[in-house]
Amino acid sequence: MVDQRHIRNFCIIAHIDHGKSTLADRLIEFTGVLTKREMTDQVLDNMELERERGITIKAQSVRMDYVADDGEQYVLNLIDTPGHVDFTYEVSRALAACEGALLVVDASQGIEAQTLANVYMALEHDLEIIPVINKIDLPAADPEKVKKEIEEVIGLDTSIAILASAKTGIGMKEILEAVVNFVPPPKGDRRAPLRALIYDSFYDSYKGVITYFRIFEGTVRKGDRIRFMATGKEFIVDELYIFRPGLTPVEELTAGEVGALAATIREVKHVRVGDTITLADNPAAEPLPGYRKATPMVFTGLYPVETNDYGRLRDALEKLQLNDASLSFEPETSEALGFGFRCGFLGLLHMDVIQERLEREFDLNLITTAPNVVYRVNMTSGEQIMIENPANWPDPSKIESVEEPVVRASIITPTEYVGPLMELCQDRRGTFLNMEYLNEKRVNLHYKLPLAEIMYDFFDQLKTRSRGYASFDYEVTGYEPSDMVKMDILVHGQPVDALSCIVHREKAQKLGRALVQKLRKLIPRHLFEVPIQAAVGNKILARENIAPLRKDVLAKCYGGDVTRKRKLLEKQKEGKKRMKAVGSVEIPQEAFMAVLSTDPDED
């Protein structure tokens, strides 16, 4: 049993690319958890996709033994956190499991938007924050400027800031000493009823769901009967583990320690991030605070290109759901695309990652429909309904008002790009809140934006207009009334359900025109004329025609009588008329993708 005074639980907070995973690698190597031979880059990012994109998606952990300068041996638990805004709830639970945090800032870049968001979250959890200025080996590094920025923007004392380079290994000992000296040891009575916070879980095909947790009070042993307080489910602990990146079995874990357990749990939905574990025969009176169910913010339809793959897609989604309880899906059918699923995600990166994993790990070809946010529709009858699929949009005459989700966005950018970025936010129906100067060269802009407007290519536009220098972070703040309408696309007079989208009334005309022009280029020509129309209700906003292909029926007439020619042309016209009445139009897959990339400013 480890003396509580010798345990330190900490995490690393950093913006993407500021060197968080590399720093974790160096600390693991420095404390000798893994030998040089066993080390791989980014030990804690085990998903191929995480390494490739350089992002951490699932929180991982490692336990390190370290003999400090005072001669005592300490147990340091590093809990790796995802840094991206979509996974904010996972970050908040991982932070709740710690007492301290290393704030890693790139010496050449300074503070970025996501760093700020996570620092404020760490301060809310009363964590002791140790600033680490990383990448000091870079020629462009300016540690003094970054120190000043940290002091001015966040208000942290940087006299204890550590200069480090995770790449070359400079400053690792200083970081570990700072963790021992500044991060407070965990508190908590080992004899009290068990209360442990779940901060992650993953599915193992042999052992079932493996639950990662941090114990706040009490003790858990192998063979105990445990209860999850949010779901009320009970299980018997088969095995307990600590992390030496891999799972290493132990007999018991007590207050202050971080570990994992296997209890033959078959479904990940029983294990919810943020829930409290207690003992069934001696339960705690109150769960730990802060648990909430993950609510999907973005919905999209996923359809297999080959209809026979429907079963495989369902199995793949079920497998992914085992590791990711925030993914929700239900079957849906579309006239244009056949059978598929309506999936809910935490945000756009989450959607992107899941889609890429489906295509890569399960070898599926997918068509995605345009992503939608959840609208709140107040009906004239007084009831309120939530709509995430344009197909379920009610009859306009029965709608009293519509509310859409809005976010508070924070954009950190060099001063010379403020103009183009403000213009971008105005275009996206943004409301300017305020702006603050971080130093003479960088500004933090605050905007209120509709979530639907940052869904498609806002991030790409942001990077384009700031030449890649701006960083962006947002939090959903609630719902606000908005004038939203459903826009249908009619091809050959028939509405195509998969192309319908919900847009703001003011933008409907512009978007409708851009969309029909795009579809005109993508839908192949037929033997009869095909009109493409964008409509809101009964009003047609834009129309384009696809000209028909025609056979030259006069080719064999040479000279000949004009009446003969006329007869052949009339006959052709009759045939076209009949064809137009019964013909069906092929819509290629690219046409569905066009909805995703329609930017009215392109043409």
Swiss-Prot record:
Keyword annotations of the record: Cell membrane, GTP-binding, Hydrolase, Membrane, Nucleotide-binding, Protein biosynthesis
SUPFAM superfamilies: EF-G C-terminal domain-like, P-loop containing nucleoside triphosphate hydrolases, Translation proteins
Reactions catalysed according to its record: GTP + H2O = GDP + phosphate + H(+)
Enzyme class: hydrolase
EC number: 3.6.5.n1
Biological processes per GO annotation: positive regulation of translation
Lipid bilayer topology: Peripheral membrane protein
Residue ranges constituting the tr-type G domain according to the UniProt record: 5-187
PANTHER family per record: TRANSLATION FACTOR GUF1 HOMOLOG, CHLOROPLASTIC, TRANSLATION FACTOR GUF1-RELATED
Name of protein: Elongation factor 4
Gene behind the chain: lepA
